[in-house]
Every structure is written in C-alpha cells, then in structure tokens.
C-alpha cells in the first residue's frame, strides 16, 4: 500500500504573511468599506446636530474616536472574565467611564467647544457605534486588533463629521476652520480661511435640514466612487 505525500507548499502559511492584510482590512473597513456613518448610518443624531462647522465636528469626532479606542481595548482585555449574561450593562459602565473622562478633559482644556457640543458629549454613552463595536468585535478579538478597530471606526466617523462640517461651514458662513483655535490652541488661528465673501451665507446650510442635504450628497458621492471600483 503506497503512502500519499502532501506537498509542502499546501501548508506553507505563516501568521506573519497574513498579519499585514488583517491590519489593512481593519483600517479600510473602519474608514471606508464599513464606515459607521456613511454605510451603517449609525450615530446620526450627534452627526447632524453638531456638524455645522469643522471645529464642533472635529471635537465630537475626536471624543468618539478616543472613547471607541479606550472601550474596545478595555473590553477586549477583560473579555474572558466578563460574565456573558450581564455583559451589556458592564459594557455600558465601561463606556460611561471613558466618556466621563473625555468629558472632564474637554471641560478643562477645550471649554468653549465643550459648551458648544453640550449634551452630545455625554450622549456618546448611548451611541450605537460604541456599543456595537464592543459587542461585535472587541468581545471576540485580541486587544491589539480591538484597539485598532476602535481607532479605525472612530477615524471613519471623524472624517465623515469633518467633511460634512466643512461643507456646511463654507456654504453657511463662507469660512473654513473658524474657531479651530478653541480646540487645538492659539496656533490654529492661522488655519482660518475666508473662502466665500458674502454679505450673508446660506442659512439653510447650518440648520438641521442642511445637515440632511449635506449627508445625502456625501452618501451619493461615496456610492458613485464605490460603483466605479
């Protein structure tokens, strides 16, 4: 009876060869392919409410990014000891702790932006994006991958917020990066630009209906780009 030999090339797969594609996939999923705002359409309430300029949009985006990264890391770190039956309340407590920390930091170092964002900073606790990534990804994957997933998802939301905020600020006020120094410091005053010299901007752009119209335009552009690929 002859023995069949398995070619060595069939089992020549190492984690090192696969690992780079994992990081790339997590990044592209979070920023573009599975963007929490433009694909999943999650967290629209704060997105539409505070994106009337770049400063507010960037402030909320960075806060959400930090919360996603921190909570994903902590939940993944303790995923094996968190009881399955009460995991959701525990996730909410972890998220609330991270949000409170970010809220206190914003209150201390970026108070004008904190005042402008108002209730939408503490409402990050109830954001479907944060609890969704905790349940769907962080509770099932390694700490490093979970932290990077939180960063990528947060970055995708931040970019969406900033683009929408820029469109609304330009059309509504004719400026770009106005008040950014309130978030990033006095050096950011040099970034302010007057793009449209109008007696009065289009008020609709900085009102809630303008947010819906702007988001619809961004979604349309993304769909066109995806179809051409």
From Swiss-Prot:
It is a multi-pass membrane protein. Its EC number is 7.-.-.-. It is an enzyme of class 7 (translocase). It is found in: Cell inner membrane. Keywords: Cell inner membrane, Cell membrane, Electron transport, Membrane, Translocase, Transmembrane, Transmembrane helix, Transport. InterPro entries: NqrDE/RnfAE, RnfE. HAMAP family: RsxE_RnfE (MF_00478). Part of a membrane-bound complex that couples electron transfer with translocation of ions across the membrane. This is Ion-translocating oxidoreductase complex subunit E. It comes from Glaesserella parasuis serovar 5 (strain SH0165) (Haemophilus parasuis).
């Amino acid at each position: 009876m002859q023995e069949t030999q398995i070619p060595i090339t069939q089992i020549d797969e190492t984690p090192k060869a696969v690992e780079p594609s994992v990081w790339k996939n997590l990044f592209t999923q979070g920023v573009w392919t599975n963007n929490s705002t433009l694909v999943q359409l999650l967290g629209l309430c704060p997105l539409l409410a505070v994106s009337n300029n770049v400063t507010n949009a960037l402030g909320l985006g960075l806060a959400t990014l930090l919360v996603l990264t921190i909570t994903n890391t902590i939940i993944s770190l303790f995923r094996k000891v968190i009881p399955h039956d009460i995991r959701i309340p525990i996730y909410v407590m972890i998220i609330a702790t991270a949000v409170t920390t970010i809220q206190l930091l914003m209150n201390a170092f970026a108070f004008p932006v904190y005042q402008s964002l108002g209730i939408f900073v503490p409402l990050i606790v109830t954001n479907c994006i944060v609890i969704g990534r905790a349940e769907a990804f962080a509770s099932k994957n390694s700490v490093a991958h979970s932290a990077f997933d939180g960063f990528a998802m947060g970055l995708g939301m931040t970019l969406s917020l900033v683009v929408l905020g820029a469109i609304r600020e330009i059309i509504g006020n004719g400026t770009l990066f106005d008040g950014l120094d309130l978030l990033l410091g006095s050096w950011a005053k040099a970034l302010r630009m007057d793009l449209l010299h109008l007696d009065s901007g289009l008020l609709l752009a900085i009102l809630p209906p303008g947010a819906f119209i702007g988001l619809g335009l961004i979604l349309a552009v993304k769909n066109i780009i995806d179809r051409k690929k």
